[in-house]
Amino acid sequence: MFRANPLYIGDSATDMQTAKNPGLLAVGVTWGFRSAEELTSSGADALVNTPADLLPLFERGLLAVDAICKAFTKRGFGFTYFPTVADALPYLTDTCAGKSVSLGGSMTLKELGFPEAFSNSTAVHWHWVRTGEFFQTPDIYLSSANALSETGEVVNIDGACNRIAGTLFGPKRCIFVCGINKLCPDLESAIDRARNVAAPLNAKRLKKKTPCAVDGKCHDCQSPDRICRAMAIHMGPPQSMERCEIVLIGQPLGY
């Protein structure tokens, strides 16, 4: 599901145009001379924020958005792709304007600037502040995911389980906001990413006393601090929701 076209990597508008002239795929690096917005407007097909983020592109190429969109939409999910955070923010803030919104704990959402990015017309609730009817039945539940499969599944692991609960039942609409680093070839690799990439990073961030926080891999431990208490795999939208969608952003975000 990835293109085999050669990549042209650069850090300027001239580089992006140089790539486009012979029909190459342009990858903009954001640690150079130009901002993400300038690179995108100059024709960048993808952006990377660190040198380490280049490795998946070397191994697999740029994602074929149309194929991934089809994988999710044939399962009934909504799907929208934005090249950059700056492109995605207006869609998210406009969608949530005038609505009640609950947010799941997410490094991706924090990197996007939420909840501060919302307008004053949006009633926002962080799910760890208080529980109750507002959290359970908002107009929109905004979350991220530990992994997305290119075959159209969404994978999340949770400790308190209030985050995955909000993606399964109660809200009228659920939006998963994810960076390209969350994409995996299939369901098996998506589960592996959730267990051996996202969970260890979160355990370390939260200073949990678990083996994965030390060596970065899942031991299926029984530690009291274990944050892998439940796993949710969305194979399609919950029947009770009006809409469940994926917003994919062409930049690495979160864990």
Where are each of the predicted segments found?
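Acidic, Mg2+-coordinating phosphoryl-transfer loop and its flanking beta/alpha structural elements
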Residues: Y8-V48
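N-terminal active-site beta-alpha-beta segment that forms phosphate/nucleotide-binding
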Residues: V65-L142
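Conserved phosphate- and dinucleotide-binding cores of soluble alpha/beta proteins
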Residues: I140-Y255
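Short, structured coil segments at secondary-structure junctions
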Residues: P22, S42-G43, R75, S121, ...
